[in-house]
Amino acid sequence: MANYLAQFQTIKSSCDRIVVAVEDVSDLWLNVKESFEQRLPVKKACLNNKARNPVFVENLPAEFIQTTDSRLRSRFPQDQYLFWFREPYATVVLVSCEDLDEFKTILKPRLKLIVQNDEREWFIVFVSKAHPSNDQASKMAKRVYARLESDFNTKKRERCCKFDLHGPDAEFWDDFDSKMVDCIRNTLDRRVQFYEEEIRRLSEQRFTPIWNFCNFFILKESLAFMFEMTNLHEDSLREYDELELCYSESVNSPGKHREFGGLDTGDDQAALLNPGFKALTQIVQDDVFREFEFRQYIFACQAKLLFKLHRPIEVAARGYAFVVSFSKTLALQENGLPFCFREVWVITACMDLIKATTSHYDGTAVAIDSEREFCRIQGDLYSLCRIKFLRLAYLIGYGVEIEKSPVNSASLSMLPWPKPATWPSIPPDSSAETMAKEKMILQAKSREKIFNIHRKPLPLEPSLLLREANRRRAFLSVGNISELYDSGDGSGLDANSKPSPNKSASNYMARTMSGPATSETSLPVDRPMRLSEIHVAAEHALKQTVSDPNFMTSLSSLEEFEKRYMELTKGAADNYHHSWWKRHGVVLDGEIAALFFKHENYDLAAKSYEKVCALYSAEGWEELLADVLPDLAECQKILNDEAGYLTSCVKLLSLESGLFSSKERQAFQSEVVRLAHSEMKHPVPLDVSSLITFAGNPAPPLELCDGDPGTLSVAVWSAFPDDITLESLSLRLSASSSADEGLKAIKSSDARVLVPGRNIITFDIPPQKPGSYVLGALTGQIGKLSFRSHGFSQDGPVDTDEFMSFEKPTRPVLKVRKPRALVDITPAVSSALLMNELQWIGLIVKPIDYSLKDGILHIDAGAGLKIEESQMIEIETYGSDVEHVGGTDASKTSSSSTDTRKVEKVPIEDGKIKIPDWASDVTTLVWFPVRAIDDTIARGASPASPQKQSIVDGMRMIALKLEFGVFLNQVFERTIAVHFTNPFHVSTRVVDKCYDGTLLLQVILHSEVKATLHVKDIWLDLQSGFEHTGKGDGRPTSNLFPLVIAPSSRAGILFVIRLSALGDMDELEKADSMLNIKYGISGDRTTGAHSPVPVKPDDSEELVFKIAVKMKRPVLDPCVAVGFLPFSSDCLRVGQLVNMRWRVERLKNPEDASLLADEILYQVDANPQNWMVAGRKCGHVSLSNKQGSRIEITVTCVPLVSGYVHPPQLGLPHVGEANISCNPAGPHLVCVLPPTLSTSYCIPA
């Protein structure tokens, strides 16, 4: 079967669509050809895939070919099954007949003969030539078509359709397409089953000696190609995948040696996307194909199918994996391949994949995740191509011009040198090229970095090229040691170390006479190659390997190499930036920046370096950052970017101290200080969080009360290598419950010099709001620049630097308590003091865990109260603090003294008292004299005026304000009420009436104070209408003075009086009797009222108290009697009318002429909230002057509320109360019932 390989490839290249055979029985094809071909490709077809599942295929490619065509008739029967995929998938039989007899005798037998082949899928198209206007011909055509249907249609399948030549309808084309697709589907199913059986038969022979992979390949690819022709690309791809696996097993199986391939011209150019790169007959070897060409052929077929499936992302992914794996295969065959064949092939393969997948990729039709994945794979392809290209550049001598960056080191150190069987020898007549390479090596020197930074170069190769090349020379196993380790190429581990002058001669001799010098006959045939010669030899060998002149152009000069190197690096970086692996793109930006820097394009170099530094800083890769950051600083310095340059210098100082020497770090600091003190055009605040860090002391946090200032000590660490002077330093506190740093900065005005390491800085804390505070930020100024630090440090041992950390501390450094009572001031006396007398008022001042040192007490007396400032204020200890103060006072510790109470007299000025120092921490009692002023005359209680004086009248208010604290910032304010009262409350009553008209008047003295009262004398000045009996001096009948009245007790005194002649009634009503009491008081000021404070030394202790007493003449001879008549009803209800009746009777003729009138004025007084008066409230009634005359007054009222209420009262305004007798008296309260329930408002249940 392998002999058919050439024929198979020819058939496959010429067959790109399925064939539909046309059996033209009635010579109709030319008439219907155009109409039929317009139906191709089939717009929609339902086919079965390999798993027998229906698949809808769009635009199925097909071609109509007549059975008489040479393309079908020239095929041999023996290869019909082998290449069955090219045979027709359906047969369309075109017939036409206008006579039924002709159909029976001629057409029907011929059709029977055509369709008797069971392997052919067919259907009949009856072409009607009858014109629509010819009814007879149309009827005959219908009869013939009906007979055709009955002869060739079956119950399971209809095989006939009618085509009207003069105007086919749409239903015919639908029927035609349906029948054609059914035939194609059935044929495809049968052929798939055939190929599967043949493939299964051959697969069973895979481990037998007769196994032939070429036969298996032809069957497998025939099936795959048949799927591809029918647009079943998924099934075709699956067949190629299985074919690849089967080939891998076959080629890796032990057996005879097989050629690998790759030795033909042009094989260095990858053919991953060109399946027709070589004919299959060229790569076949016995029963299998050469691996180099066949693997690329299989991948090219897979890629072609994936592109048809619109899956360029999968092509890129598969392609990258194939290039990596096939590169390993090439490495195993490197001894038999041309020099650097693997590197060249990988570069061309990656570039072909990038171009093809990019051209087929439509980014608008994919999801964002798929787009990023595609860009990631493209970046990998670019990166792989870039590294291989970089390796070629090192081989031909351009390595000295390449930036020795960490990314290049990491990539190239894992990429071995080429391993040919024999390293290429230097061609003849190449001395000029050798000298040019030698000159390039000698003139190459590493770029000096800013600040004279010297860093050990990173290795870029797994081993020295010089040793590797000489080791692989066929006639020399190893060279002279000094020759093999020559580092003049700059690619060794000590690239920056220059050879000393005394070694130059020995090096020259080593190059001339390499090898051991034991004897003259032991010299080698040829000396080891120098590095320049290795570069020249590699370049000439590479030219023999590379077949693409454009590829070799990119290595022809250093400029062309850098151009191509920039394209590859930019391609990788740009794709990584649009993918998931953005960090890879940023790292490659550093390589782009190095080229920009080399060509003095500092602006673009700085932008790229900024991205790289930002990434390294965020990831914490300080060693990598230390390699790139100086380059950024140099670009910024050249561009005169002072702000950026300053920031870079600060970052360099922030890096780990071991990455730079002390001199280098001091150079960084000097640049920072120089810029800070210079006139910058655009000064920017510096973030020195990694250089200046701070933390609170390990001691407990500073605790302050609300409103108090304080002093906070903060430990500040400086990472500067030398002392640095700060023009100012400020600290911000942050509430631990909030991240807001809105608190005002606490400034330290002095210039601070921070030494390297730990510094203790103190800050004066102003009053803060209550809460817990942590360190927020440290700000300040270095020269003319402001800086800010958020670098928090954890507490740790003071003697070590292990406490340094950048974690925010949670331990607070300051706690401000919530507002609480720091002091309490309460009155020392709760009982009443004497009114209008100078009395001591005591205040208990109690500090609550807070010092009142230097405190000032403000006393503001309210209305009716006066402070006597001429008197000294007394301050004494109080309560349990007596012993404490006494024990600390040396003046009170004498053995003869048993009272340790400390008393001090201080003056009061403008209501201010200064608290003594000894009283700042103990509870004290402050006594100051006040006088409550009341100009009104006290009034006693009597039946005529029973009201008692209200306690509110004796209240006086004192406003207290205590300023204390360090800066008198704490204020305590309170207003206290002090009760003042008269010493006595007097009530009078007539206890008896004698026969001679005298009255016994009892005066009861009630003590109003908690002190003992000594009544020394008392007399009563009577009002008009009364007079004393006896001596008439107003004294009581008995002489019991001095009379002692205990606290809260009372005493009674009798006066004998009688009525006297009446004067004016108005004056009599207004006049009062005056009771005069001369008394003394003995009390303690700690209890309440006490003896008045003497203003002058000769002030008497006797006091006089006057009180007015209202006396009313008794009703001894009434003129009119008013009696309340009972209600007509026993019960009163709300809303019910009630008649109030009073009877008025004249008892005698009045002596007063004003009472002789016949009419009397009456007035009804009722509470409007309880009663509604329906009649007249006020009016005149006629009452005769004769004794015994009577009259009844009736007023109708309505009660408004239920309960016990006062009834209305009848009054006679023109008749005095002394002339009216109430008999019978009216009720004090009456009961009013609620109204009866009204059924009209009831709702039935």
Curated annotation (Swiss-Prot):
Alphabetical keyword list: Endosome, Golgi apparatus, Transport
Location of this chain's protein in the cell: Golgi apparatus, trans-Golgi network; Early endosome
Domain of life: Eukaryota
Entry's Gene Ontology BP terms: early endosome to Golgi transport; intra-Golgi vesicle-mediated transport
InterPro entries associated with the record: TRAPP_II_complex_TRAPPC10_C, TRAPPC10/Trs130, TRAPPC10/Trs130_N
Main localization, broad class: Golgi
Compositionally biased region (Low complexity): 495-507, 888-898
Region (Disordered): 488-524, 884-903
Assigned GO CC terms: cytosol; early endosome; TRAPPII protein complex
Family in the record: Belongs to the TMEM1 family.
Function field: Specific subunit of the TRAPP II complex, a highly conserved vesicle tethering complex that is required for the proper transport of proteins in post-Golgi trafficking pathways to the growing cell plate in mitotic active cells.
Subunit text: Part of the multisubunit TRAPP (transport protein particle) II complex composed of BET3, BET5, TRS20, TRS23, TRS31, TRS33, TRS65, TRS85, TRS120 and TRS130.
Name the UniProt record assigns to this protein: Trafficking protein particle complex II-specific subunit 130 homolog
Protein source organism: Oryza sativa subsp. japonica
